[in-house]
């Protein structure tokens, strides 16, 4: 089956695992998925990220992170720029998620970065998703 939106697939798998409080999520790997997962790791939304090979397919194993009593750390994930409707922002229009409590993932000419890093670098780009 050909996947039309691999980023939405990644976010949906993480969202579904978060709802039922799974410890581990496995998704097919790509450079953009790896970059988004790395941002989630550095921002503290997931516990661990591991890349491995399953036969001929590269996979990402994402270890979910929960608080005490299995409280969710990730309260929301939203895909913003979709294949049918791309959303871009200029360097002075970089969005803030929940007044800075969340993270916007932006694809820029300097790579895939958070909204704070994009503001610091002074670049705009395609707004991929919001995480809060």
From Swiss-Prot:
Pfam families: Ribosomal_S8. GO terms for molecular function: rRNA binding; structural constituent of ribosome. One of its GO terms (cellular component) is ribosome. Transmembrane segments: none annotated. Gene3D superfamilies: 3.30.1370.30, 3.30.1490.10. One of its GO terms (biological process) is translation. It comes from the Bacteria. Belongs to the universal ribosomal protein uS8 family. One of the primary rRNA binding proteins, it binds directly to 16S rRNA central domain where it helps coordinate assembly of the platform of the 30S subunit. NCBIfam families: PRK00136.1 (NF001109). Part of the 30S ribosomal subunit. Contacts proteins S5 and S12. This is Small ribosomal subunit protein uS8. The gene is rpsH.
């Amino acid at each position: 089956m050909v996947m039309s939106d691999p980023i939405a697939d990644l976010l949906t798998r993480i969202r579904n695992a978060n709802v039922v409080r799974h410890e581990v999520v496995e998704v097919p790997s790509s450079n953009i998925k790896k970059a988004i997962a790395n941002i989630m790791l550095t921002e503290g939304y997931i516990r661990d990220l591991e890349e491995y090979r399953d036969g001929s397919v590269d996979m990402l194993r994402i270890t979910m992170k929960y608080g005490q009593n299995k409280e969710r750390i990730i309260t929301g994930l939203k895909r913003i720029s979709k294949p049918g409707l791309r959303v871009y922002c200029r360097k002075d229009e970089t969005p803030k998620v929940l007044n800075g409590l969340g993270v916007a993932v932006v694809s820029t000419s300097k790579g895939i970065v958070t909204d704070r890093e994009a503001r610091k670098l002074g670049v705009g780009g395609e707004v991929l998703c919001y995480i809060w």
